[in-house]
Swiss-Prot record:
Protein name (database record): UPF0303 protein Oant_1766
Superkingdom classification of source: Bacteria
Stated family: Belongs to the UPF0303 family.
Gene3D superfamilies: Haem-degrading domain
Length: 169
């Protein structure tokens, strides 16, 4: 399969993920349960990551696992800024860079010190409220960061993570 074909399929699947993974409500308890799930998966699978769950005005959850580095915290901050700006998955924006209608265009004049175009940031969308924050993972290759977030959010919401997973590359 050509890379462009894979990107189109992956973008379409990420849009489906964004439409399907909607929380009925979201608070500190939801953030803790979801963050704990992400960390548990990472520990069980020996993944060196940092993860953060934040609303626009404050951080609700932060954790790291063995193998993560101080750089991961900075990546979390920059990915969060991208989700806050565009209300979209950071990995979708990565894949859209080869398209004419890309959202993360250079003309947007975003400072690379504050914005990271890398997978692993996903919007927290609440029914009736819209996007209120982000779930972020850093430490793995960007597609794997994204997949870890999707797996955990889908499981947390009682949805099938396999049905929502990106196609293998």
């Amino acid at each position: 399969m050509a890379q462009g074909d894979d990107s189109k399929q992956a973008i379409a699947q990420i849009i489906r993920q964004e439409q399907a993974l909607i929380f009925p409500s979201f608070d500190e308890n939801e953030a803790f349960a979801l963050g704990h799930r992400i960390r548990d998966i990472a520990v069980k699978e020996k993944l060196g990551i940092a993860t953060e769950i934040s609303l626009w005005d404050r951080q609700l959850f932060y954790a790291t696992t063995a193998g993560s580095t101080v750089d991961n915290q900075e990546w979390l901050r920059r990915k969060f800024n991208v989700v806050r700006r565009f209300h979209a998955s950071t990995y979708r924006l990565v894949l859209e860079q080869n398209r004419d209608d890309r959202m993360f265009a250079l003309h947007k004049a975003l400072n690379v010190e504050d914005y990271a175009l890398a997978g692993g940031g996903f919007p927290i969308r609440v029914a009736g409220a819209g996007v209120i924050g982000a779930v972020i993972v850093s430490g793995l290759p960007q597609r794997e960061d994204h997949n870890l977030v999707i797996r955990a959010v889908a499981e947390h919401l009682g949805q099938d993570p396999v049905a929502l997973a990106l196609p293998a590359v």
